[in-house]
């Protein structure tokens, strides 16, 4: 009887442990009319892929002026997209007008990037809100916590795992940190984890770019309860869900938006800090 009881307890522990180690992934697109956004087909492609894969979630980092051209050249796809972007499948995570790297321009210029970009996006998609700042390229600078909070953002992400050739943040912390600006303003942030190493034999990636088991195991060993990877695909690529779909999703990952991850999945708060001078 004691042996049977021990086996049952072991099975319960294993099931609980496996459940707590669910992997998550934030997919999306980045680009724009001046970089890479094939206007003739891209918007309809996004709409069709979201319809085909109802469990897919994406974050959009598209130069706001792009939508002026999309509205003119592919009006039907534009109309369909307007309905989808206010659904739980989509989150806009970088509304800056031209996706600046931020660390090489002044604070006033950064503010204008957000101001003009948000106004343009709201003109096209009035129901869109801006909750999380997340980028594919390393568009970070120390004053962002204050600026983001002033524009109504609640969260930030310091990962850029598939575009490290432009730069990358220091590896620090666990599931969440408070990113603190020079003025003392904090913003709840998903960092580049301390266990998130640079990818071997690559000059542009960290291990978080595709939810490999080695990355997820490192996260679990580091005590990260809800490990998450990300990749915002180039808008010029004709590719849907980055990790696959249905029963073929890599590492049994679940697609989420960053807003959903912060508010419904992550540990929600932390006392750990990064960035305070």
Where are these regions (language model features)?
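Conserved S/T- and glycine-rich ATP-binding loop of Class I adenylate-forming
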Residues: 1, 10, 276
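Basic/polar N-terminal segments that are highly enriched at the extreme N-terminus
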Residues: 1, 18-20
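Sec-dependent N-terminal signal peptides
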Residues: 4-16
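Catalytic-domain carbohydrate-binding cleft regions of carbohydrate-active enzymes
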Residues: 21-276
């Amino acid at each position: 009887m004691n042996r049977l009881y021990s086996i049952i307890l072991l099975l319960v522990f294993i099931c609980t442990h496996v459940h707590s180690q669910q992997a998550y992934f934030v997919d999306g697109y980045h680009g724009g009319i001046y970089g890479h956004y094939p206007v003739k087909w891209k918007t309809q492609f996004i709409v069709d892929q979201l319809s085909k894969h109802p469990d897919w979630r994406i974050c959009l980092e598209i130069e706001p002026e792009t939508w002026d051209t999309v509205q003119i050249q592919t009006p039907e796809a534009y109309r369909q997209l307007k309905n989808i972007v206010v659904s739980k499948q989509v989150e806009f995570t970088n509304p800056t007008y031209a996706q600046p790297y931020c660390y090489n321009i002044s604070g006033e210029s950064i503010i204008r990037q957000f101001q003009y970009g948000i106004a343009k996006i709201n003109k096209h998609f009035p129901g869109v809100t801006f909750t999380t700042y997340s980028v594919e390229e390393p568009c970070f600078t120390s004053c962002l916590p204050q600026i983001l909070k002033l524009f109504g953002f609640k969260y930030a992400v310091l990962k850029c795992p598939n575009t490290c050739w432009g730069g990358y943040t220091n590896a620090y912390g666990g599931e969440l940190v408070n990113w603190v600006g020079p003025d003392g303003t904090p913003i709840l942030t998903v960092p580049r984890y301390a266990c998130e190493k640079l990818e071997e034999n690559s000059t542009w990636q960290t291990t978080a770019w595709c939810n490999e088991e080695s990355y997820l195991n490192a996260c679990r060993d580091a005590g990260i309860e809800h490990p998450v990877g990300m990749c915002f695909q180039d808008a010029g690529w004709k590719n849907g869900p980055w990790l696959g779909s249905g029963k073929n999703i890599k590492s049994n990952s679940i697609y989420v938006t960053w807003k959903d991850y912060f508010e419904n999945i992550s540990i929600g708060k932390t006392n750990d800090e990064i960035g305070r001078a």
